[in-house]
Amino acid sequence: MNFNDIETMVKSKFKDIKKHAEEIAHEIEVRSGYLRKAEQYKRLEFNLSFALDDIESTAKDVQTAKSSANKDSVTVKGKAPNTLYIEKRNLMKQKLEMLGEDIDKNKESLQKAKEIAGEKASEYFNKAMN
């Protein structure tokens, strides 16, 4: 074997190694991207858990307010003030009921979003590890 043969062989091996290293670097980059996305979705899921806790706390407060509104704690003598009180109390009950329904809808939406975020986090984590 002369020097040119050795040089040619080394250069071809170097090209193979370089190509292989580039493929590995690309794979690492892709998997790192998946891990970043998985981490972002996990963080989103975590934050949505706190939002759900806040909504549940608010729902309990609204439920307490609705229960309190159903109790007649004020007695007014005379028809006119009593009628006004009843109308305002009924309006408050109606608004609290609407607020409760909105809270329930928001709670469902947040729960679905949290589930989807968890699924996406798992999906990207699995992509990164496979």
Swiss-Prot record:
It is found in: Secreted. GO terms for cellular component: extracellular region. Disruption phenotype: Deletion mutants display only a small defect in acute infection, but remarkably are unable to promote persistent abscesses during animal infection. Its main location: secreted. The keyword Phosphoprotein does not apply. Keywords: Secreted, Virulence. Induction: Negatively regulated by EsaB. Belongs to the EsxC family. Forms both homodimers and heterodimers with EsxA. Homodimerization is calcium-dependent. Required for persistent infection. This is Type VII secretion system extracellular protein C. The gene is esxC.
